[in-house]
Amino acid sequence: MKKIRKYGIILFAGLCACAAWSCEEDKTDRKFTPKDPVIKLGGDVEVGKAGGSYTVPIESNLPWRVRSEADWILLGEVENGMGDGEFTFTVSPNKTLFEREGRVTAWITDEYAQSIRVVQAPSSPEDLEVHWYVKTDGSADNDGMTWETATTLHNALSKSINGNFIHVAAGTYVPEQSLAGSKGAAEDVTFEISANVSLIGGYPADAVTGAVADPDANPTVLSGRLSGGRHAYHVVCVTAAKADGGRVLMKGLTITEGLCSGTASYYTLNGARFYISRGGGVTVGNAAVDIADCKITQNKSAKDCAGICIVAGADVSLTDTEISENECSNGNGAGLHNEASVVRMDRCTVRGNSASGVCGGVYTFSSSAPSYTYIYNSTLCDNRTDGSKNSRRGGAVYSREYSETVLVNCTVHGNTGGNGGGIALYGASGKESKMTLVSCTVTGNTSLFVGGGVEFTPYTTMNVYNTVVSGNTAANGGDDLVGTNTALAATANLPAVLSYAVNGSVVYGAGKAVVAGSSFDPATMLGPLAGNGGPTQTCLLLGADNPARTLGMPYVDLSALGQDFDPQIGPEITGFDQTGLSREGISAMGACVK
């Protein structure tokens, strides 16, 4: 019996050992082996010019994600998955005459990715002659091809293509659709202009066939005031791609009550960043735009640029347009900000804009690329910075690094700032800037530090021709036209060119030569800012013995001077004053020679 028990114990131990060895062997056999990633997409997609939504099947044995490589291809809600599935994307209408191609890419890792091409047909020339008609009570169900079948503004904008015209009846229009690619916050709604169309306001509210636009009689307002006390970050966003000879036209519109965020996040469209903290009225990104007979007024920003922000290589012309009463509560450039773009202004008024930072009026600055600003026959008045620091420069105009700015026939009056109450020019080593004043009047401006009229710093080139800078005040000296050193103290520096000009009481002829026996008194020789003819306000030259009336640059020399600029400034600009009066036979300085 004892032997049986002994052998039983031995047998049991052996069985346990075998079981343990078997389990260990099983663990080895069942060791995890990663799958080789496999991902496959459907074929390339051909899309008509009108765009649309598309679904693409995907085969994958591992988790995947998908991305769009073009801003006109917008992904749907599904951007990832765990295995076999599908995703959708929407293609925007192709509002150009050219075929375009983009890609959608799905990937497991960077090494395991698949792409499909999305090829979209172009619009045809006959598509470009369409006229849309919009009323406040228009319906998205209407075709919008007549006043009697008017549609909504959003419907017309979304369906129009390059070369179309959109006629808008009087009334107030509020955006309801989010900017493409945005997060869809309530404040992301905007009127997006994504094609080179003409958007024309000023028609009667009850317009019928044959109606004529008159913006003064029929205000057409694009307002950022939303329900619930909210405001759109941008009332208008121009995202239209540049096309040969094509430009956006905005005419006869009032753009108001946008409110930018204090958060500097952005969306990228058309190769440009659309910051929600800039451009409460209008933001233009890498587009070609003409703005005529418009008002950009009473927009606000919790950070920068409340009025109009122009960025990323845009080309914008403003004519007969008012930029007024826009306010930055915690930033710079309240009226207009030109960043790495080209801006032209003619017969415009920039009035009553305010910034807590620098520049109440026209701000030109990019940290990395040239910005070009050309202002003709315009008045910049009553703009201000808070002026609490000398660095709060440029009440009306502040041009910074890499900038080139030209003012011709302009009146700069009643502005307030830190240094450079009216105009400031700033540069840095390797980032020089340049400004030229031709036939301008700079008066009645105030600096709480240095340079009541005009201040320029080292690393800048300031050229002054046929211009009156007088009657300005500065708390720390340099009332009128002054260069400052690195300590920002007033100096006797004169600009690179000071020709046929007045600085304070001193009258200059050609080449900085002081005219002996001549003196200028702004109190008796300059009139107040007033309507003296023409579309903008000016200051008259007063008194028969006023040297600025007779010692200015001759007409022939002014015409020749314009040919030296790039681009050239023609005699239709240099040969007339701000009110439109010919300078021929008159050798008078300043913006108004009447």
Regions found by a protein language model. Give the residues of each.
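Bacterial Sec-dependent N-terminal signal peptides
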Residues: 14-44, 112-117, 121-128
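Solvent-exposed, low-complexity, repeat-rich "mucin-like" stalks and linkers
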Residues: 25-29, 38-67
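Surface-exposed binding patches on compact interaction domains or structured appendages
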Residues: 38, 59-88
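A short beta-strand micro-motif common to beta-rich folds, especially ectodomain repeats
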Residues: 98-110
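Right-handed parallel beta-helix/beta-solenoid
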Residues: 123-155, 170-174, 528-531
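Extracellular beta-strand-rich solenoid/capping regions of secreted or surface-exposed proteins
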Residues: 154, 159-162, 176-198, 207-251, ...
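Predominantly extracellular beta-rich ligand-binding scaffolds that present long acidic/polar faces
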Residues: 165, 176-196, 208-215, 290, ...
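C-terminal accessory segments
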Residues: 229-237, 494-495, 507, 511-594
